[in-house]
């Protein structure tokens, strides 16, 4: 049995862009649905009646431009909830700061999503 999800992405090759993304996330974090906390806590609170299997870290990676990242952020349920609650688009509001930190908007950066995974077998 396994349960998995991916956590917030990181931009390890560019600390300035990563920090700008973290600031963006902080602005919408309270708008995530409550069940998102399971992922944030890496499924630690999930009743898991199986013999745990140790799983090595498995990241997902992609090379994305700033435009692609901004488009992706716009799909988040937290962003949609923010817009519904405030009438404002947080992606548009943060885009100038994200762009300044990113540099060349056409440049692709390596985006890394840590995989959140619990695996086990029936004992």
Regions found by a protein language model. Give the residues of each.
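Conserved catalytic/acceptor-binding region of the Class I
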Residues: 1-63
